[in-house]
């Protein structure tokens, strides 16, 4: 959410009624947690924090699934990260969490699937809120990095299949890919930005977007790191990059 809020004026803090109206009108909304939506979750998290159970898989499951189920959804796709840059450091723990969330969610009548995706290395080329928004816009215009585009198509394809909006995953993923290249995904994103207080005019040109995000700034500095020897970059530690 903090990435989206790097867009000037954009707010994820909207009321439940406004949230529901926006979904009815344009088909999507991205909002922060509300005190009147699963209010027990915040209290439970406070208890987890002081009892050393933040990493408890059953409690993580209840926290995540309760918010999704409270929205009254019929289908859900979960992107469960694992690796150095993720909360779950190994694929075994991520798989255990995935199975727990899928089981509970399906038991509540929500058609749910989970994808395990690695966060050992950064996804895409950018790190940082504004830079990642810029890269997301490039992806919505069909010009994004291949790994990010693939993840978007996999998650979107599974959701279309799960919701019955496509006959199978392949058709769903193809439709998502088409939306990235025909401009419809970007257009829908602009609708959401405008509905949640952001300035859609920022996205009219690359220069206006760079200025709006504070990236086109003379105070920005860059440094060059010279390799000590000739070779290939074999690995990039996502957590080390995040901590810079």
Across the structure, where does each feature detected by a protein language model lie?
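Well-ordered secondary-structure scaffolds
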Residues: 53-60, 67-70, 74-244
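Active-site cofactor/substrate anionic-group-binding motifs, chiefly glycine-
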Residues: 1
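Phosphate/pyrophosphate-binding betaalpha-module
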Residues: 5-71
């Amino acid at each position: 959410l903090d990435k989206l809020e790097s867009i000037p004026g954009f707010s994820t803090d909207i009321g439940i009624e406004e949230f529901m109206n926006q979904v009815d009108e344009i088909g999507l909304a991205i909002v922060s947690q509300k005190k009147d939506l699963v209010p027990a979750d915040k209290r439970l998290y406070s208890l987890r924090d002081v009892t050393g159970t933040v990493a408890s898989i059953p409690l993580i499951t209840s926290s995540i699934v309760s918010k999704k189920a409270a929205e009254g959804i019929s289908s859900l796709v979960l992107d469960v990260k694992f690796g150095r840059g993720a909360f779950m450091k190994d694929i075994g723990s991520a798989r255990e969490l995935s199975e727990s969330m899928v089981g509970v969610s399906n038991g509540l009548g929500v058609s749910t699937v989970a994808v395990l995706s690695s966060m050992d290395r950064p996804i895409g080329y950018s790190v940082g809120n504004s830079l990642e928004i810029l890269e997301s816009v490039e992806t919505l215009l069909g010009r994004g990095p291949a790994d990010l585009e693939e993840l978007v198509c996999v998650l979107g394809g599974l959701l279309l299949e799960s919701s019955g909006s496509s006959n199978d995953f392949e058709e769903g993923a193809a439709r998502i890919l088409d939306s990235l290249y025909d401009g419809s995904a970007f257009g829908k994103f602009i609708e959401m930005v405008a509905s949640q207080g952001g300035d859609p005019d920022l996205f009219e040109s690359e220069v206006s977007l760079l200025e709006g995000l504070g990236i086109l700034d003379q105070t920005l500095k860059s440094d060059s790191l010279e390799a000590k020897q000739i070779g290939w970059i074999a690995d990039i530690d996502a957590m080390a990059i995040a901590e810079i």
